[in-house]
């Protein structure tokens, strides 16, 4: 049956079929991802981008073609992730430009629009490289243009252009040595061909649900050869944001970004631009880009950690949020994956421990006119993390702040419901925070290293939570009062009486006072005695000491607890900035894990 035109309804179905085909193949795309960085997330990034489009177009299946293509372009820009996702976003921007005059199109009109889309894709990159998705896009579009001159049938034209795209894909190893050495084709190019195959299948069958299993054509040996080390990257942070402004000059924007990193991709319009870059200083990047407009939807991934996940032999991933306080070397050693909390000073937005350091945070806390606010990681951040990990691990345990204190647990749970690991997945309420969550996470991480089975790990988590307590002493009550958790009247009374509150987490997960010490002198010596008295003669396995830029008392406490409990494992860590919002400068916490 001849298909003579493409309208909004058909375009909706075509997109759905094509996107579903790629979603089915995202794990494979992650495995063959070696360029520009072997961080194993091309499939995840393309899938995340396309899922965002699908969610946005669901209510709009009966719009005219030009109206629907505008919605697709906007959704692609908002949801683009990674180098490949931002290139796709600019492709859909260009396609929308080409389809703007039409409620429906012929093969030749669609081919003309595809050329604009491909041209726009090239403009997104400062240094376009052949042997990538760009080569596949160009071959597909050129073939569409040629075939549409001789046939008005979309089915016939699509078949010819798919063959051209596949040929270009198979040639990518000849264009990029890194692909040839790894024995793979370009991952993003393969993703685009997968979309085309899904569309072709839909045209042939008329049924979106009948998607064939795609033969990748590569052996397991080839997949193993993609495990390239990325520990020594000059620009290790894959960094993205959206800039909203009045008249964003893309040429000037790209020149501004050029000294700050590589793999620069810019998509969007004069009023809304999505930028992608690999950099060594995300905070400096966001601050620099603010001259062009409001910087929104900040995202930063450490590609070194992603690469370690690709190479990891572990079968179970452990995820925490950034309120879990552990020293960086412990997080790295045990491959603990961190989803950062967000915080802001007025309109200035930051990613906890990524785009703001502890020193920077406490400096702003002292001098900013705005008291900072925190917000839990959005479900999209968790979803992207889980999607990536599901390609490299069989199971996941995600450990988070108490449900009664934050929406972090709920957001993680909502995201995990949309991602399926091969074997097991669960969200655990730590019923603790900071160093308390840290000692629980460390217990689980060490058990994962020893190949403990998933059911036993869940039981171990429950047992460790039951045996963990955290005590927190505040140097001042200023931050807790400014954050709205203590009234001005109560603060004045406590200060007048010379009381020092000691806080802990109840068995239900609430943060409440559990005692006081008296007198403003030697606060932390008194706190030390308070905690030792609480511990009494109990056997302690692990101690986590955390502080808000107050290292000297923290170090003294480390010596005290190592002496009092010589068999215990003791670590010292900073309070994360997100907790510093409420605890303030100088706060000290002591987490105890009992045997």
Locations of regions flagged by a protein language model:
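Charge-rich, low-aromatic oligomerization/scaffolding segments with amphipathic character
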Residues: 281-298
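Short Gly/Thr/Asp-enriched flexible loops that form oxyanion-binding sites at enzyme active sites
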Residues: 82, 89-93, 398-420, 439-442
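Generic N-terminal targeting/processing segments that precede catalytic cores or assembly contacts
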Residues: 1-59, 256-260, 265-266, 279-285, ...
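A generic structural motif
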Residues: 271-280
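Mixed-charge interfacial surface used for oligomerization/domain docking
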Residues: 119-123, 135-152, 156-272, 306, ...
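Acidic, glycine-enriched active-site microenvironments
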Residues: 9-12, 16, 20, 24-25, ...
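Glycine-rich oxoanion-binding loops at beta->alpha junctions
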Residues: 45-72, 355-390
């Amino acid at each position: 049956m001849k298909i003579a035109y493409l309208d909004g309804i058909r375009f909706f179905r075509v997109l759905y079929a094509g996107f579903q085909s790629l979603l089915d193949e995202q794990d494979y795309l992650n495995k063959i991802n070696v360029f520009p960085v072997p961080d194993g997330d091309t499939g995840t990034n393309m899938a995340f981008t396309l899922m965002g489009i699908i969610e946005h177009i669901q209510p709009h299946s009966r719009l005219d073609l030009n109206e629907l293509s505008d919605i697709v372009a906007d959704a692609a820009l908002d949801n683009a992730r990674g180098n490949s996702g931002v290139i796709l976003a600019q492709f859909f921007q260009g396609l929308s430009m080409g389809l703007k005059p039409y409620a429906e199109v012929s093969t030749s009109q669609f081919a003309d629009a595809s050329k604009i889309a491909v041209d726009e894709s090239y403009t997104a990159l400062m240094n376009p490289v052949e042997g990538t998705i760009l080569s596949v896009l160009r071959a597909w579009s050129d073939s569409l243009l040629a075939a549409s001159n001789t046939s008005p049938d979309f089915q016939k034209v699509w078949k010819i252009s798919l063959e051209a795209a596949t040929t270009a894909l198979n040639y990518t190893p000849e264009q990029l040595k890194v692909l040839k050495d790894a024995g793979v084709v370009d991952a993003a190019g393969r993703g685009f061909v997968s979309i085309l195959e899904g569309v072709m299948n839909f045209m042939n069958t008329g049924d979106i649900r009948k998607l064939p299993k795609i033969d990748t054509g590569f052996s397991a040996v080839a997949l193993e050869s993609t495990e390239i080390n990325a520990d020594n990257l000059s620009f290790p942070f894959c960094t993205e944001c959206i800039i909203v402004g009045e008249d964003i000059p893309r040429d000037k924007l790209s020149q501004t970004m050029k000294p700050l990193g590589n793999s620069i991709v810019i998509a969007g319009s004069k009023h809304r631009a999505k930028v992608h870059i690999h950099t060594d200083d995300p905070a400096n990047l966001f601050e620099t880009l603010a001259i062009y407009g409001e910087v929104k939807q900040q995202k930063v991934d450490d590609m070194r950690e992603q690469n370690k996940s690709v190479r990891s032999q572990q079968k179970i991933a452990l995820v925490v949020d950034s309120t879990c306080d552990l020293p960086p070397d412990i997080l790295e050693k045990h491959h603990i994956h961190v989803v950062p909390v967000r915080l802001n000073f007025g309109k200035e937005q930051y990613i906890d421990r990524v785009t703001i350091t502890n020193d920077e945070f406490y400096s702003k806390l002292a001098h900013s006119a705005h008291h900072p606010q925190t917000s839990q990681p959005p479900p999209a951040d968790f979803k992207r993390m889980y999607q990536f990990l599901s390609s490299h691990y069989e199971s996941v345990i995600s450990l988070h702040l108490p449900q009664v204190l934050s929406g972090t647990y709920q957001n993680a749970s909502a995201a995990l419901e949309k991602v399926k690991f091969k074997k097991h997945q669960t969200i655990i309420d730590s019923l603790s925070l900071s160093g308390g969550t840290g000692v629980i996470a460390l217990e689980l991480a060490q058990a994962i290293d020893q190949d403990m089975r998933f059911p036993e790990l869940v039981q171990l988590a429950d047992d460790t939570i039951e045996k963990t307590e955290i005590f927190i002493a505040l140097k001042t009550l200023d931050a807790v009062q400014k954050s709205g958790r203590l009234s001005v009247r109560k603060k004045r009374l406590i200060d007048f009486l010379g009381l020092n509150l000691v806080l802990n987490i109840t068995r239900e997960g609430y943060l409440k006072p559990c005692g006081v010490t008296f007198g403003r002198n030697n606060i932390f010596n008194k706190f030390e005695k308070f905690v030792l008295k609480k511990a009494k003669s109990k056997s302690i396995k692990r101690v986590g000491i955390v502080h808000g830029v107050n290292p000297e008392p923290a170090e003294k406490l480390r010596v005290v607890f190592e002496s009092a409990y010589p068999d215990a494992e003791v670590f010292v860590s900073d309070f994360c900035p997100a907790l510093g919002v409420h605890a303030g400068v100088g706060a000290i916490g002591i987490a105890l894990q009992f045997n």
